[in-house]
Amino acid sequence: MKLDIFAGQEKSELSMIEVARAILEERGRDNEVYFSDLVNDIQTFLGKSDADIRQALPFFYTDLNTDGSFIPLGDNKWGLRSWYAIDEIDEEIITLEDEEDGAPKRKKKRVNAFMDGDEDAIDYSDDDPEDEDFTEETSDVEYDEEDPDDEKSEVESYDSELNEIIPEDDIEEVEINEEDDEDDEEEE
């Protein structure tokens, strides 16, 4: 293989990524290359041994992915990003994904491993009708509406309970002097 772009340069000084770019440019847009074929072409051009290529392969693949001038086209095919307009790149990728989808996948039926066809077995995943008996419905609960007469009877019952504890005769009358309270606030 001969690449005119590298005429007069020492092959040992060339990187695999530079050679890959030159190979793809020479082949042209309609000739995307499988990764393995690209690596074989690079090995042939540079004249490197299999051991040298195997050692450099992880770094080359990383460079191929991180270098912005290459684009994966699916099925491990590679091309140059400059071959495609930005909108066209999305379309290429989408059409490749659509082709891979093929027939729609059938959903698997869920099977309970503990239900081995025994009709008498209890299926605990179903809602039990007994559970509904324990719930209270809010429509059955009646709330007391406020009635002023009820409040009076509550106050009277409270007072009568207090009188049982402390009879009224034992309660001392305390005078509240509001003027004293105002003076205390002014002093502070």
From Swiss-Prot:
Function of the protein: Participates in both the initiation and recycling phases of transcription. In the presence of the delta subunit, RNAP displays an increased specificity of transcription, a decreased affinity for nucleic acids, and an increased efficiency of RNA synthesis because of enhanced recycling.
Gene responsible for this protein: rpoE
Subunit and partners: RNAP is composed of a core of 2 alpha, a beta and a beta' subunits. The core is associated with a delta subunit and one of several sigma factors.
Residue span, HTH HARE-type domain: 14-83
UniProt-recorded Gene Ontology molecular function terms: DNA-directed RNA polymerase activity
Family of this protein: Belongs to the RpoE family.
Region span, Disordered: 117-188
Gene Ontology annotations of biological process type: DNA-templated transcription; regulation of DNA-templated transcription
Pfam families: HARE-HTH
Record keywords, A-Z: DNA-directed RNA polymerase, Nucleotidyltransferase, Transcription, Transferase
Organism field: Streptococcus uberis (strain ATCC BAA-854 / 0140J)
GO cellular component: DNA-directed RNA polymerase complex
HAMAP family (UniProt xref): RNApol_bact_RpoE
Name of the featured protein: Probable DNA-directed RNA polymerase subunit delta
